[in-house]
């Protein structure tokens, strides 16, 4: 089921027994039957922190545990209390998201389990392997900080992926060599600058037309680099606002040429009566 306001999939949350949009906060009750086919045999799947909490409770009934994620951490004082309890060994098992993967120093962690370690590889972002390697390395670094040797278990469907293998082997240099080789081959940073244009507005047809007009104009003005046709953004709609994006790969040293052309088009857009907003992001950190 998708959010009627944002157009993205809703996420089930056990604490409200309902569906929740992480972009706009829209909530819906858990459906009794499928809204498409009418079948009532609905089954919850996935390996989120709430599901892990259920499994921990079932498998380790004699151990104490706590969960730390965005849902629990936003409550005042919860994060400090949970971490203090774990540090004092009053809590045996700490379940969490990336919140607990870095920046924490406990001398009593003997085992770290990284669930679905390859899930970040599926994000449409050229930095996905780097972020996967970074996350595994940081999470693994929580184990074995005291006198006892730590152990790390990585769950993955892609054990042969170079980012997963390098992280498991603590091979930073090997990962870096392969990552830079692929980025050079695909004309990604640091060999090229990446410029992302984001077009947004409340009329999808107008947003798509404006993006197409910019694409045509840029191709007439510039004859170097790579200018890709605009497409709906991975998250195409947020809070009733439609979003398209266009990617440009700019050779190093030619950024000024592209920025000059974009500045000209942006001034023309500001002087027009169009209701489409245009954002320009150089070497963006997110492509969502």
Region spans (language model):
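Inter-lobe coupling/hinge segments of SF2-like helicase ATPases
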Residues: 1-198, 203-208, 245-248, 252-253
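Short secondary-structure junctions
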Residues: 60-63, 218-226, 270-275
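Hydrophobic helix-cap positions at the C-terminus of alpha-helices
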Residues: 85-86, 143-146, 218-221, 265-269
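A short, structural micro-pattern
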Residues: 146, 191, 240, 272-274
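Short amphipathic alpha-helices in soluble, non-transmembrane regions
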Residues: 210-216, 257-267
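A carboxyl-terminal module marker
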Residues: 216, 220, 225-239, 278, ...
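Structured alpha/beta or helical-core interaction and ligand-binding surfaces enriched in interleaved
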Residues: 227, 252, 261-265, 270-276, ...
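Short, intrinsically disordered low-complexity segments
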Residues: 229-255
């Amino acid at each position: 089921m998708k959010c009627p306001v944002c157009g993205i999939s809703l996420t089930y949350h056990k604490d409200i027994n309902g569906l929740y949009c992480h972009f706009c906060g829209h909530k819906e009750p858990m459906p009794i039957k499928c809204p498409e086919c009418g079948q009532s045999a609905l089954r919850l799947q996935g390996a989120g922190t709430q599901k892990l909490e259920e499994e921990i409770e079932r498998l380790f009934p004699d151990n104490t545990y706590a969960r730390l994620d965005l849902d629990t951490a936003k409550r005042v004082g919860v994060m400090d209390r949970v971490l203090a309890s774990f540090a004092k060994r009053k809590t045996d098992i700490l379940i969490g998201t990336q919140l607990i993967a870095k920046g924490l120093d406990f001398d009593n962690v003997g085992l770290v389990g990284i669930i679905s370690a390859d899930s970040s590889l599926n994000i449409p972002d050229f930095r996905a392997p780097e972020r996967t390697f970074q996350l595994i390395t940081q999470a693994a670094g929580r184990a074995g900080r005291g006198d006892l040797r730590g152990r790390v278990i990585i769950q993955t469907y892609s054990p042969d992926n170079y980012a997963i293998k390098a992280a498991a082997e603590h091979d930073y240099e090997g990962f870096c060599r392969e990552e830079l080789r692929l980025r050079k081959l695909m004309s990604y940073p640091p060999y090229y600058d990446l410029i992302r244009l984001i077009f947004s507005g409340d009329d999808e047809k107008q947003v798509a037309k404006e993006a197409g007009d910019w694409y045509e104009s840029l191709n007439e003005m510039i004859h170097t680099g790579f200018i890709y046709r605009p497409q709906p953004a991975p998250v195409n709609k947020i809070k009733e606002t439609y979003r398209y994006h266009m990617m440009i790969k700019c050779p190093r040293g030619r950024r000024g040429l592209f920025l000059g052309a974009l500045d000209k088009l942006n001034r023309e857009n500001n002087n027009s009566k169009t209701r489409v907003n245009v954002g320009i992001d150089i070497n963006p950190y997110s492509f969502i």
